[in-house]
């Protein structure tokens, strides 16, 4: 799996960017750009289980691999949820799981720089 990397600088303090991106309402707002109605169920605490879901309830089953407040969060995606059933062991899922979604937040002049990477590690 190829690692994809995206970067953006946001004119806001790092703590505000973090809180907005990971808070329930802020998460719904920014993910609406690619999946209207997306939300999560669970906690951002290290080791916690978290589900990323569409309005129909389909989505991903994941866990928080790392969480350093206002600096870095790593999501380990373990499988899919389809029609209420968690799948972490099918051939389809084993082809890509685990996959990681990492967010790095850093201070820059005038705001916060966010680097997002998606891949196997």
Language model segments and positions:
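Hydrophobic ligand-binding cavity/cleft-lining segments
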Residues: 1-39
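A generic structural signal for beta-strand entry/edge sites
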Residues: 1-3, 70-72, 109-113
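Short acidic/polar mixed-charge low-complexity motifs
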Residues: 2, 56-58, 97, 110
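Hydrophobic/aromatic beta-strand elements that line small-molecule binding cavities or substrate pockets
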Residues: 6-8, 61-66, 98-107
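Hydrophobic pocket/interface hotspot
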Residues: 17-21, 27, 50, 64, ...
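Short, solvent-exposed secondary-structure boundary motifs
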Residues: 29-33, 51-56, 90-97
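Glycine-rich portal/gate segments that line the openings of hydrophobic small-molecule binding cavities
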Residues: 38-89
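Beta-strand/loop substructures that line and gate deep hydrophobic ligand-binding cavities in soluble
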Residues: 77, 84-121
